[in-house]
């Protein structure tokens, strides 16, 4: 059902082992959305390749200061839509300067071809409401559809808004579920 990890400025980056665990538990596509403090813009990186994703994440760790960097990661388990890069979260609307990821299933959003329920919500519901009424109206829409899901948005200035109940670890990281933890029995599952 996917996982979102949110790191706000001042919180240390999640370690590589944690990110690897997220990817192993949710292997159907990966995204990293971060505020690039060097040029002041939000960047979105999406891939189907776990190793490419981890390499890109490590390069962000080396080139960005945890004290000033906001980011979120998303690892996908496909429930709607096929396994392809375009269905990886970190959906972007360039006119609104927003990136979006979702964890859960949006039961009230109808299937639209090969799109995920997340992309359908973002593109066909959220963006029109946001363009019309800003965050005030968008918050109302989110409350109406979120259920047990989790959402995260980042604007082009690196501001993060998140919705739903997240797990907060001792370091201040937020996770949408526990699939970032290596479970004690996982050793036996690797055949």
Positions of predicted regions on the chain:
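Extreme N-terminus nucleophile/cap motif
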Residues: 1-57, 71, 166-191
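Short beta-strand scaffold segments in enzyme catalytic cores
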Residues: 2-6, 29-37, 73, 89-92, ...
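Regulatory input/activation interfaces that engage signals or partners
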Residues: 52, 64-65, 69, 73-75, ...
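Acidic loop->beta-strand submotif enriched in PP2C/PPM serine/threonine phosphatases
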Residues: 79-99, 141
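Conserved beta-strand-loop-short alpha-helix elements that form
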Residues: 97-111
């Amino acid at each position: 059902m996917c996982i979102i990890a949110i790191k706000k400025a001042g919180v240390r980056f999640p370690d590589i082992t944690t990110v690897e665990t997220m990817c192993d538990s949710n292997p159907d596509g990966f995204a990293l959305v971060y505020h690039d403090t060097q040029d002041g813009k939000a960047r979105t990186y999406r891939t189907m390749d776990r190793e490419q994703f981890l390499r890109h994440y490590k390069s962000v760790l080396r080139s960005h200061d945890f004290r000033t960097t906001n980011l979120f990661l998303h690892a996908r388990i496909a429930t709607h839509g096929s396994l392809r890069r375009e269905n990886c979260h970190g959906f972007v609307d360039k006119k609104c300067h927003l990136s979006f990821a979702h964890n859960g299933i949006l039961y009230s959003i109808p299937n639209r071809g090969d799109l995920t329920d997340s992309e359908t919500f973002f593109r066909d519901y959220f963006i029109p409401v946001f363009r019309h009424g800003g965050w005030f109206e968008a918050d109302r829409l989110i409350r109406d559809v979120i259920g047990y899901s989790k959402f995260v948005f980042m604007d082009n200035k690196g501001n993060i808004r998140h919705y739903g109940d997240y797990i907060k670890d001792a370091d201040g990281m937020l996770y949408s579920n526990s699939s970032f933890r290596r479970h004690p029995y996982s050793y036996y599952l690797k055949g």
